[in-house]
Regions:
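Short beta-strand immediately N-terminal to the catalytic nucleophile in serine-hydrolase-like folds
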Residues: 92-97, 124, 191
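Short beta-strand/loop motif that positions the catalytic acidic residue
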Residues: 183-185, 190-192, 196
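Catalytic histidine-centered segment of alpha/beta-hydrolase-like enzymes
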Residues: 222-236
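Short, surface-exposed "cap/lid" segments of acyl-processing enzymes
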Residues: 7-8, 13-61
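Catalytic nucleophile-loop/oxyanion-hole region of alpha/beta-hydrolase
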Residues: 57-89
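Conserved alpha/beta-hydrolase "acid-adjacent" motif
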Residues: 197-203
Length: 254
């Protein structure tokens, strides 16, 4: 994947650079610019930020099939980004993920060979339950329920990849996190607007109810992944305080 770095400010009021890096993962259809919203928080904490691209996002090289994997495939690119951080001075990392980037980040924490280096996750408007999200958009677009069910089957069935163009089927249950709350192993902060009409907030709230490692902070009045735009001071303060407390705690195990 391609990436750009933002180092902590080199002025006397800034904190000493941390050996914890922030790995920023944008959402579907967005670019690395989406992740710049987190810079006030990471700069305040002295974190180096790596703003990465991933397969098929129009900045990184495309995969063989040229298709998004909804987090099922892209996590491998985050693992490579963590490799880079660990070989350039980082001892551990915090994953930031917006929208589908949230799904990618959770898959990374679950599957990556570098997962032990992940201290925490900060997710903004994350897509956490793809089964529910597909049905939601089926209803939103006034399509028959069977259309959504067919879409799920086409994406997930090995025999139908020739119709979808996917190199491999996507196991949607594996990336529907309220069904896998017990598999959350890292402290996770979720910021999600209750007025998000593209990726509804309910799975985020539900995951926080099901996992003691997940903290959910609702926003109001913001469209999808625009929580920072509505109230940048609250967003930055929430993330900074939460990460300060989390990074001061013990290193997660497993």
């Amino acid at each position: 994947p391609d990436a750009s770095l933002t180092h902590p400010q080199a002025d006397q009021d800034a904190p000493r650079p941390s050996t914890t890096w922030a790995i920023m993962v944008h959402g579907m259809g967005a670019t690395r610019a989406e992740t710049l919203r987190a810079l006030d928080a990471t700069q305040a904490l002295g974190l180096t930020s790596l703003h990465m691209s991933y397969r098929n996002d129009r900045e990184a090289p495309a995969s063989e099939d040229g298709r998004y994997g909804l987090g099922f495939t892209e996590w491998r690119d985050v693992d490579v980004a963590i490799d880079y951080a660990l070989t350039h001075g980082a001892r551990d990392v915090v994953l930031f993920g917006w929208s589908m980037g949230g799904s990618i980040s959770l898959q990374t924490a679950d599957l990556a060979r570098n997962r032990r280096a992940i201290r925490a996750l900060v997710l903004d408007g994350p897509a956490l339950d793809w089964l529910e999200l597909i049905q939601y958009h089926t209803h939103l677009n006034k399509l028959p329920l069977t259309i959504g069910q067919l879409g799920v089957k086409m994406i997930s069935h090995p025999a139908l990849t020739s119709f979808t163009g996917l190199k491999e089927p996507i196991n949607l249950t594996r990336i529907s996190w309220p069904h896998r709350a017990d598999d959350i192993t890292r402290p996770t902060l979720i910021l999600h607007s209750t007025d998000d009409l593209f990726v509804p907030y309910q799975p985020s709230a539900r995951l926080a109810e099901l996992s003691p490692l997940v903290d959910f902070v609702p926003f109001t009045g913001a469209s999808h992944t625009r929580e920072w735009n509505i109230d940048p001071e609250r967003w930055t303060t929430t993330v900074t305080r939460w990460l300060t407390d989390t990074l001061a705690g013990p290193q997660p195990q497993g």
